[in-house]
Amino acid sequence: MTNKEQNSKNGHTYRATWKDYSEPTIYLLTMNTEDREPLLGELVEERIVLSAYGKVVSEEIKRIPTYKDASAIQIYRYIVMPNHIHVLLRVHKKLPHPLGYYISWFKLQCMERCSAIDGIPLEDGGNTRLNRTQKRPIFGKEYHDRILMHQGQLAHMARYIQDNPRRVAMKRARPDLFRIRQNIRFGHMSCVAMGNIFLAEYPQREVLQCSRRLTQTEIDAKREECLYQAANGVVY
């Protein structure tokens, strides 16, 4: 494996060809389970109840910095979802190997540890489809990474990870709000939209516009004004 970690599938690379993946960087990693099966748990309201496999994966994520030559890796935050995981991590100093080397080891450890589990049910007693008769990968071959390069991205991604179960629960409860609508017309304009389209017809509507020239004090004041207006029925 090269430092550029060019993993290709059907001509598409999942890695940044210009990036040395052994260098210090902050990454948001996403790994899907094999065939996107819900092996790692289930969503109960707005929380994830981990399966036996999910608990192993959660433990193994925390163990990544203890792998050989991996002490420069710091796990900031992670979330285990039923069929995928998000891991926010930082490489503090140059690694002996590209990041993909450690991800491959992580996947191998998950497979080895989970192969010893034979149909252990969910903690809450729910049904499980986790029976296996032979070793099989828990995760798919590929993983996706997002390289964080701008100020504020770390806090934003940390919130994104933390909010993942709530967003999934919302999508399941109101799938219509997350469906992309084509050719929505407002007066003489046509656009693509997603969300509660009925709000666009609400009588109390305001346009929210902010400039980069605003000071933090002005931004805070605008925020308080908008929250007050929204609480009183205004749609932005």
Q: Locations of the language-model features?
A:
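Short catalytic/metal-binding and nucleic-acid-binding patches
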Residues: 1-236
